[in-house]
A protein has these predicted regions:
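Cationic, low-complexity basic patches in intrinsically disordered or flexible, solvent-exposed regions
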Residues: 3
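Active-site acidic carboxylates
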Residues: 25-120, 171, 180, 186-194, ...
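A short glycine-rich beta-strand->turn/loop micro-motif centered on a GG-aromatic cluster
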Residues: 144-148, 168-182
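Low-acidity, Ser/Thr- and Arg-rich intrinsically disordered low-complexity segments
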Residues: 12-15, 24
Length: 201
């Protein structure tokens, strides 16, 4: 009613109706906002196991806090390999067996066991096209990524999701991610920022 009163001096009812329609559409966009939190590869082998490092261990508490307090839907990814890993291209370039399905190293870290029943995506590559396509079909408007490693699987999934969902707001929480090294972590964040992925410092 206030908005109509403010425009009472405008003689064209068409202009009034167009403005009210625009306001209604804007409010509708707010109402249908749909958020998703994607937890990338928070598995034992990347934290305390074969490929773990101090940087990854240091962000565990931040990740757990984020997961426990988000109002978004939650999904997670699992880096997943078989016993033939040494014969794959990745295995030849990174000859460290890790995240072999069914082993303790493949499992989510104990601190995140409470989300293991949520939707998840097993992937034998850095990025998951299955995840990106699923996000498109679900109609999410905002997607935030956290996890490890920033410079490998986080950036790969952020870019893949962006490619499949160009109009979705993609963000990465830097404080809930860690890389192979601090420098590679920073480099990956800068690269994503350059591709219009929002970085939360």
């Amino acid at each position: 009613q206030k908005q109509i009163a403010m425009m009472a001096d405008e003689k064209s009812p068409t202009r009034i109706s167009h403005r009210l329609f625009a306001t209604s559409c804007s409010e509708m966009r707010v109402r249908v906002s749909k958020k998703l939190l994607v937890v990338i590869d928070m598995q034992n082998d990347f934290i305390t196991g074969a490929l773990g490092n101090a940087q990854c261990r240091a962000v565990v508490s931040n990740v757990v806090k984020k997961v426990n307090h988000t109002d978004a839907d939650i999904v997670y990814t699992l880096d997943t390999h078989g016993e033939d890993y040494p014969d794959t291209q990745e295995g030849r370039k990174l000859p460290v067996k890790h995240c072999i399905k069914g082993t303790p190293g493949w499992e989510l870290i104990p601190e995140l066991e409470h989300i293991q029943e949520k939707t998840h995506f097993e992937k034998n590559t850095f990025g998951s096209t299955q995840l990106a396509e699923w996000i498109r079909k679900q109609g999410y408007t905002e997607v935030e990524l956290i996890g490890v490693c920033t410079d490998i699987c986080v950036i790969s999934n952020a870019m893949t999701i962006k490619a499949f969902n160009p109009e979705v707001e993609i963000s990465v929480d830097a404080g809930c991610c860690a890389g192979v090294t601090p420098q590679s972590h920073k480099t990956a964040l800068d690269a994503m920022k350059g591709c219009q992925i929002r970085i939360e410092e």
